[in-house]
From Swiss-Prot:
Organism field: Arabidopsis thaliana
Induction (UniProt): Up-regulated by light. Not regulated by circadian rhythm.
Family: Belongs to the uroporphyrinogen decarboxylase family.
Binding site residues for substrate: R80, Q81, A82, G83, R84, F99, S129, D130, Y206, S261, H376
Coiled coil: none
Protein name: Uroporphyrinogen decarboxylase 1, chloroplastic
Function of the protein: Catalyzes the decarboxylation of four acetate groups of uroporphyrinogen-III to yield coproporphyrinogen-III.
Length: 418
């Protein structure tokens, strides 16, 4: 079976540079039928979307939404859509109990990634992986213990520790590239293949703390006691993650999501200093090399950071479920697309309540530039019936029907006609 590379969205021919340098030696109310909470600027676009939908572009629906193009319905996928809530995954995990094996073996990665695609037909198929997967490729070995989770035996906290790091070695990540190629071929243009990375700050929390933590006291203290070392680490991570993003795109990813999972643990001012500049650098570099690849940016607990997140240059801002979608749209404006943000707990609710919440979120997001998703990952124990209903509801949505009663006459705003 050939693993020939799909058409690259990147302007560079190859992205395997080994010459990386670094500073040192690396609960909702039922819908009111009359409710309209999308911003007024979308009203004409809602009525005019039919014209743009005749475009000959071969981009999957999710990519079009990420780019803010007019489409007929919101595309849908779920964070953690492949995983422990699915019976087929549980059966496979019994045969292959090591998470590292499941996420670092091409055959298993492809099989697990395709499980929700085969069951529910989402509009996005995300590679089954982990934000820590690339760490050994640049000098940070780690283990995953059943109770403690990821464990890094030798944290990086000093200038001497930094010498253990090296440029990212893609020979150690071939399983990622091969898996993306196969996924791209398997789903064709029927769905977008999504790759993902962790943001430098979030990855650094594991490397500095030595694993997961509830307090982040060690790395937060480093901001004041060893800022040069922390900056050097973040700079090294930024270069490695940039190359890893481009590697994923060149091997088939239509779209990339950046997870700053623990960025919300910082004050807005500290996030502006210790996370945002490095994310901006990644996005700027990727946009130069892969200008047609949309980048989604998500922070858990991002209600106080939306405007700052927009400033990174990401194409799509993911909202967690604690953010009101209408308020998020108002604060972000029409220049970026949004993703989200159904509360994952709604998947445990009666199906009619789930339907109402999906419709409410879609109405608040407006008829353009919205990727329907949860506000966080799928929870363990989520009924598969509810996941199936989520995607079926999304497929049956139609912007023209949802917004037809709320579009003012063209004469009211002729300057907005496109």
């Amino acid at each position: 079976m050939s693993l020939s590379s799909p058409t690259s969205a990147c302007s560079s021919s190859r992205c395997y540079s080994s010459g990386l340098s670094f500073p040192i030696g690396f609960g909702s109310n039922p819908i009111n039928v009359g409710l309209v909470c999308y911003p007024k600027r979308y009203s004409i676009a809602a009525r005019k979307f039919v014209v743009a939908c005749s475009s000959s572009s071969s981009d999957p629906l999710l990519v079009k939404a990420a780019k803010g193009q007019a489409i007929s319905r919101p595309p849908a996928w779920m964070m953690r859509q492949a995983g422990r809530y699915m019976a087929v995954y549980q059966k496979l995990a019994k045969k292959h109990p090591s998470f590292r094996e499941r996420s670092e073996n091409t055959d298993l990665i492809v099989e697990i990634s395709l499980q929700p695609w085969q069951a529910f037909r989402p509009d996005g198929v995300i590679i089954f992986s982990d934000i820590l997967t690339p760490l050994p490729a640049f000098g940070v070995p780690f283990d995953i213990e059943e109770v403690k989770g990821p464990v890094i035996q030798s944290p990086i906290r000093t200038e001497e520790d930094m010498k253990r790091l090296h440029p990212i070695d893609f020979e150690k990540l071939q399983f990622v590239g091969d898996s993306l190629k196969i996924l791209r071929r398997e789903v064709g243009e029927h769905a977008a293949v999504l790759g993902f990375v962790g943001a430098p700050w979030t990855i650094a929390t594991y490397i500095v703390e030595g694993g997961t933590t509830r307090t982040y006291t060690v790395i937060k203290n480093m901001c004041h006691t060893a800022p040069d070392v922390l900056r050097a680490l973040l700079s090294h991570l930024t270069k490695a993650i940039t190359e890893y993003v481009v590697y994923q795109v060149e091997h088939g990813a239509h779209c990339i999501q950046i997870f700053d999972s623990w960025g919300g643990q910082l004050t807005p001012e500290m996030w502006e200093r210790w996370s945002k500049p490095y994310i901006e650098e990644i996005i700027h570099a990727v946009k130069k090399r892969c200008p047609d690849t949309p980048i989604v940016f998500y922070i858990n607990g991002n209600g106080g950071l939306l405007e700052r997140m927009k400033g990174t240059g990401a194409d799509v801002i993911g909202l967690d479920w604690t953010v009101d979608m209408a308020d998020g749209r108002r604060r972000l404006g029409s220049e970026v697309s949004v993703q989200g943000n159904v509360d994952p707990a709604y998947l445990f609710s009666p199906l009619p309540a789930l339907t109402e919440e999906i419709e409410r979120v879609v109405k608040c997001a407006g008829p353009k530039g919205h990727i329907l998703n949860l506000g966080h990952g799928v929870l363990v124990g989520t009924p598969e019936e509810a996941v199936a209903h989520f995607f079926e509801t999304a497929r049956n949505l139609d912007y023209q029907t949802l917004f037809q009663n709320h579009v003012p006459a063209e004469k009211a705003e002729p300057e907005l006609v496109v």
